Amino acid sequence: MSDDYDPTAVAFKPGDMETDMNTGEPLALEAEAAAKDPAHNEESGEDTNANVESGTLVHQGDEPESIDKEDKVEDGPDTKSDGGVLDEPKDGEQRDDEKKEEHKPENPSEEVAEDDDYVPAAVSEPVEEDSAGGGSVGGTGIPDGAISSLAASTTIPPPSDPNQVGGGASSTSNNNNSGPDNNKRKRLATDTIGILEDRIAANPRDMPAWLDLISTIVRKEKLDESRDIYERFLALYPLSAEIWIEYITLEMDNGEFKRLEQLFGRCLTRLPNLKLWNIYLTYVRRVNVLSSESDKITEARTNIIKAFEFYLDHVGIDRESGNVWFEYLDFIKSKPATTTWEEQQKNDLTRKIYRKAIGIPLNNLSILWTAYTNFEYSLNKATARKFINEKSGSCQNARQCQTVLENLMRGLDRSSVPKSGPRDEFQVRAWKKWIDWEKSNPLGTDNKAETNKRLLYCLKQAVMSLQFVPEIWFLAAEYCFDDPLLKTEALQFLKDGLSLNPNSSLLAFRLAEYYEREADAEKMRTIYDEHIESLGKERQALIEAQGDPEAEPTAEIIKLNTQISIAYSVCMKAVKRFEGIKPGRMVFKKARNTGFATYHIYVASALMEFHHNKNPTVATNVFELGLKYCGSNAAYVQHYLDFLISLHDDTNARALFEKTIPLLGPSDAASLIKSMIKFESDFGEITSVVKLQDRLRQLNPDTSPITIIADRFATSDFDVIRQCDMLQKPKSRTDEDSDSERPSKRARRTSHGNDQGDKMEPFNLPQKIDALLRQLPNSSDYGEATFDPQRLVDLFRDVRIPDGLL
């Protein structure tokens, strides 16, 4: 393909539209957008920490010594414990030099994010101008020479409403029908658009509401409003190929070819969607007329050939693209050759296309192979066998891969509109299987670039289909991190995934860890702050949905409290590693001041202090501070108890036990007593063991004596009493830890929605039938199952066996 080809510049010349020399944007479109929204470039500030720090759990004076007396922590000798019973921490004390320091909390909204506008990996690179005129536009893979509007389309333009910029779940749609005041009034039943806008404002991930709103507005046949709703949706979910197709079709139906080319430039190279690319190819062939009356037939044919090459280079590896390979071959063959040289050139190009196609696992590979052999024999029978033998091996391998790929993709949902609601575990497993298969290099090629190309194609398909599944984004990034050549793509997967899933701790922690390894403290802190801010917004929304601020928190709110506290804990440890103990303590202080910190932040801070200089005093003070607010939490008490035992501080361990037991419920108290029985049995007195066993039986009279004694003498890997005296089988650790184990039949029946088999009793097959089945090849020989196992089970269950076979 020549370097001066622009697949979207096939209908108009660069002079057809005036553009801004700085931005490359069409001036007419910029003026139109500015007329619609005069406030488009206004910025609004917001305190991003306000929603997280809305309440206070402790006063500023309630500081542990880890913050109040930092010099003592680092010096060590001044903070030695006297070894006596625990004292209450001295709250309110603060060094003079500490008071002079003024802590300025971070405000992520004041920092310039790396990617203000969400742009997927394929077009995230800036437009580079080559003084020589060569190169490509914006790193999109579209060669230079495009119309000026395309050069400015490598990023998604901001929507008409500035409040919609930023993407992700935290963005909400705002227009005349969905303002905060209008949401409070009751909508009329006929106000369909207003009702849908309210649903979207309440939940930006309400995909049925989005699709209904788009359909309703487009049916009004008002072009500007239709464009606005498409831009709003695609600003939030730019990987939705089906919506891009609708948008492009709208512009095509209205003859807006210049806008159409801009849309192609924004989405084509980043979305490996065959239907979208087919529309592009149809458009190119539509505007390049191959008429004998045309004086530009040679130029038109060249444009179409380059468009075919562009298409096949990006999505030609898709198994469903076989028809386009045939279309390209037919187009090449249709050109009349006037000289022997032209005929030879046409045959060489045709052979090149055939030989490239038959090495790809396409759905019509057998037909392609037959056509190729006929083509070679029609040219020269003497050389045909040589050419055919050279490619027969790769074609046979591609056929086998095509069979496996067909089984892998059976039942796979490749639509790219985000799916709201619970995740589909079947789809997640199916995509993982395809990704793993592509990573294994099934074609056996030595070309690393081709292997990476197929893997990236599969990964992009997966994240398009499962946009709200952070696990898939994470796996895509990790697969790319394994190859140094794909480091840029890996980082982009993390950024794009976190943009769509801002509440994902998996993606936030992994991306922050990446920046920590790159020694970029600012970006690392920004990731943590924005993640905590997003979680805080969701928590605040749930509290407001409750209606009563004094009501008991729901399970979802409690879960968010824990998630936010753990996020603070992870951030605190990272900051301590990168910047030192004092900045880490400030993160701990910020977490406590949220008003809903769970015990996790206290445990993390205490252990961080202890491992900083191995002095237990500050750590003990932090544990004691947490005891004021988490003393009725058995898990926290257990952590504190384990810490004291690790210090060989038996006196304070027993004191803590007696102090907290009255605060716990029966179940939690029993768990703590069992832990203390184990401790006394290992390191204490037998009289203490007997007393604790009596307390346990008083608390829970149904407790079996043999259970108590079995727990005392069990080790981490062997339960001597249960396994030797009671003959109980040990619990297999492989059943818990293995991710590759074969799921049970019951689990498979449940995953397919069939529970009828749960009541079936196992039965033995007749000997002759069993012998026949044993002669069949092992299922692993096929790579993937070629039949539905549930239907096979149903067949065995319902089959009538003739008496002669029994």
UniProtKB/Swiss-Prot annotation:
HAT repeat copies, ranges: 221-253, 255-286, 299-334, 345-378, 404-440
Stretches with biased composition (Acidic residues): 108-118
Ranges of biased composition (kind: Gly residues): 132-142
Classification via InterPro entries: HAT, Rna14-like, Suf, TPR-like_helical_dom_sf
Composition-biased stretches (Basic and acidic residues): 33-43, 60-107, 732-744
Pfam entry (one): Suf
Single GO biological process annotation from the record: mRNA 3'-end processing
GO MF annotation terms: mRNA binding
Region of interest called Disordered, as start-end residue ranges on this chain: 1-187, 729-770
Localization per Swiss-Prot or TrEMBL: Nucleus; Cytoplasm
GO-annotated cellular components: cytoplasm; nucleus
Disulphides: none
Annotated Low complexity bias: 170-181
Keywords associated with the record: Cytoplasm, mRNA processing, Nucleus, Repeat
Function recorded in the entry: Component of the cleavage factor IA (CFIA) complex, which is involved in the endonucleolytic cleavage during polyadenylation-dependent pre-mRNA 3'-end formation.
Protein name per its UniProtKB record: mRNA 3'-end-processing protein RNA14
Organism: Yarrowia lipolytica (strain CLIB 122 / E 150)
Protein encoded by which gene: RNA14
